[in-house]
Amino acid sequence: MIKILGIESSCDDTAVSIITKNREILSNIIISQNTEHAVFGGVVPEIAARSHLSHLDKALKNVLKESNTKLTDISTIAATSGPGLIGGVIVGSMFAKSLSSALKKPFIAINHLEGHALTARLTDNIPYPYLLLLASGGHCQFVAVLGLGKYKILGSTIDDAVGEAFDKVAKMLNLAFPGGPEIEKRAKLGDPHKYKFPKPIINSGNCNMSFSGLKTAVRTLIMNLKEINDTVINDIAASFQFTIGEILSSKVQDAIRAYEQITNNFDKKNIVIAGGVAANKYLQKILSSCAKIYGYRLIYPPIHLCTDNAAMIAYAGLERYNNKLFTPLNFCPKARWSLEDISN
């Protein structure tokens, strides 16, 4: 049986997974570093890299045990090799290369963003092409996924990523880290129309986005408030999340128009939202309604596959394994690596 080992270490989650040729996830271990970074209110790159170094061996042993797999049963090793915090990327990539060399099994360097981009093919087995909204703490872009290694970026944030905006606003409100889930939780208790926030470049007519001005508006409001209690926090969270939903809904419409100009896929119209922000239930509902108006189906992975994980890396490795797209061991990890720069 073909088994793919995936390794993910691009940010603050140490993850290892094994999947089969039939897209079955045998094991998917994630060791979170949230408690290590919470005191700093964000991820500290050096701490993250050192934690990956100490966690990877344990994660690998747990995955092998849980999946009842021997190292010699592994067909290939796929590892995130960029983009991301370069210290962690190097640790994970070198760990994978060492296994590849020792086991004499192929190594496959995976673009972390491609892992997110292909997750819906792992979970829903959807065909190419499809429209992707990649929304996470480090990235926010609309992508036409035309095939394996064939990606066309239709638009991106011109400043902050949407996930970063969630985390920064949560920090302003003294909510726990990571901030995205905390904002969503508080928003359920608040009034989404209490505060009116700006929607930067919403009428630009293209697929680019901006969240910096929104973040600044929230900060200004908080600074000018005389009292901040739970009710105020809930209302700010709800109003902020509502505004994000308005921005993304508008930009999805722009992205659909741009996507349809470069594809002729009018039978199976799918929009995929991937990345940590895809776990937000409110945004799932809002964007599903928006997609339906245009005859599209919105697909989002289960929560445990929205955030960083190694199953998506293993699956991207499986697609490349099936196409014999292996990577030489002298491949250099990259802190920056656009989807459009992936080479097959």
UniProtKB/Swiss-Prot annotation:
Substrate binds at residues 134-138, 167, 180, 280. Its EC number is 2.3.1.234. Gene3D superfamilies: 3.30.420.40. GO terms for molecular function: iron ion binding; N(6)-L-threonylcarbamoyladenine synthase activity. Pfam families: TsaD (PF00814). GO terms for biological process: tRNA threonylcarbamoyladenosine modification. Its cofactor is Fe(2+). Required for the formation of a threonylcarbamoyl group on adenosine at position 37 (t(6)A37) in tRNAs that read codons beginning with adenine. Is involved in the transfer of the threonylcarbamoyl moiety of threonylcarbamoyl-AMP (TC-AMP) to the N6 group of A37, together with TsaE and TsaB. TsaD likely plays a direct catalytic role in this reaction. Belongs to the KAE1 / TsaD family. This is tRNA N6-adenosine threonylcarbamoyltransferase.
